[in-house]
Curated annotation (Swiss-Prot):
Magnesium keyword on record: no
Organism: Rhodospirillum centenum (strain ATCC 51521 / SW)
Name of the protein described by the UniProt record: Small ribosomal subunit protein uS8
Keyword field contains rRNA-binding: yes
Assembly, per entry: Part of the 30S ribosomal subunit. Contacts proteins S5 and S12.
Role noted for this protein: One of the primary rRNA binding proteins, it binds directly to 16S rRNA central domain where it helps coordinate assembly of the platform of the 30S subunit.
Family the UniProt entry places it in: Belongs to the universal ribosomal protein uS8 family.
Pfam families named in the record: Ribosomal_S8
GO biological process, one term: translation
Top-level taxonomy: Bacteria, Pseudomonadati, Pseudomonadota, Alphaproteobacteria, Rhodospirillales
MF terms (GO), sorted A to Z: rRNA binding; structural constituent of ribosome
Gene Ontology cellular component terms for the protein in this record: ribonucleoprotein complex; ribosome
Length: 132
């Protein structure tokens, strides 16, 4: 499988899984994907995730989606910085998603974190995606 945007693929799997009301989805594992899922879990957008060994050298992420009263917790999730057009943001220019109701996930020199954590740490970085 040759993917030019692995993170975009995982976000699409999450979006499609929520639309289909699936409780669990899978995605190939990587450090970046795991770090993004950790932020989503910490912010309460997914129930959890774990890494499964499919065979030696191949690992998958098992992502448990979250619903509130039958409706998906994630209303919107989309990629901002793409392989063909990277989007970087200074601390002063960090985006506010729906006036603070959603989050932006950033890749910073201190690791992957939400926009609120980046403001608290006073760091900018690449805006990976927005979640609402």
């Amino acid at each position: 499988m040759n993917l030019s945007d692995p993170l975009g693929d995982m976000l699409t799997r999450i979006r499609n899984g929520q639309k289909a009301r699936m409780s669990v989805i899978t995605s190939p594992a990587s450090k970046l994907r795991t770090n993004v899922l950790e932020v989503l879990k910490r912010e309460g957008y997914i129930r959890g995730y774990n890494v499964e060994d499919v065979r030696p050298g191949v690992r998958n992420l098992r992502i448990e989606l979250k619903y509130h009263e039958g409706e998906p917790v994630i209303k919107e999730i989309h990629r901002v910085s793409k392989p063909g057009r990277r989007i970087y943001s200074k601390i002063a220019d960090l985006p506010r998603v729906y006036n603070g109701l959603g989050i932006a996930i950033l890749s910073t020199p201190r690791g992957v974190m939400s926009d609120a954590e980046a403001r608290a740490a006073n760091v900018g970085g690449e805006v990976l995606c927005k979640v609402f």
